[in-house]
Amino acid sequence: MTVDRWTQLVRHQVGLGRLLPLGGPRDGAWITEEAAGAVLRRAAADGAPGVRLGALRIALADPRDVPEPVVPAPPSALPPGPLRVTADFAATAVEPLPTAASRLRLVLAGAATERLGLAVTEIDLRATDLLEPEVPEPDQPKPDLLESGQPESAAPAAGAPQPSPAREPVGTDGTAVTEAALAVPGVLRLTGSLGGPGRAVHIEEHSGAVALPRRHIRVELATDATHRAVDVARQVRAAVRDALPDHPTVAVLVTAVG
């Protein structure tokens, strides 16, 4: 691997942020902080008018209060436990800042629980700026028609950074895992973000102190925003486990919600 490619890979993985526990210790699922933050930002933009979200971080509320997950976690992932969201925000002066903060807190808590399945127990907000009141924009003229008589299509809106697409799996088991995961409702695609460029399915052996060696599989994927991320992850774990004759342990890492 060249120095430039290595630098690019490191920057990409740093951009993912923390790997946050999704659900509880028995769910065997994680989500990147980048993906979770994008969902919270969309929720704030849609559900908290007059408020603009700034810097946002998600971390364990109490690192001492964390149970062991039921499956091996992805490298450097946080253990399951209650989470704290810390964010800066700006708001207009049409209402007291504590009122704006309360509205934003409710929106963030709802999105974390209902759209993702994060166990958020604390949300710390800090007001950093005042915004000018929003002025309704005047009606815009209809778009010009093309020669075909159809209105010109607008450019697609810029969204959150998308993870690298996954390469084709190698081997029969990799193919079986891929097919099982993609068949689950709510899975948009497999991604390759954490374990090297394009690797979405990771198969390895784990041995405990008393148990015999057992295979462990990690699947990286993107979920549909209309499905709760933790519910999709649970179904993927079950589908992948049942797709292989040795019924390995399975962990799921959600790298995007779109």
Model-predicted segments: where are they?
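Surface-exposed beta-loop interaction hotspot
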Residues: 114-188
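N-terminal, Lys/Arg- and Ser/Thr-rich interaction peptides
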Residues: 1-24, 153
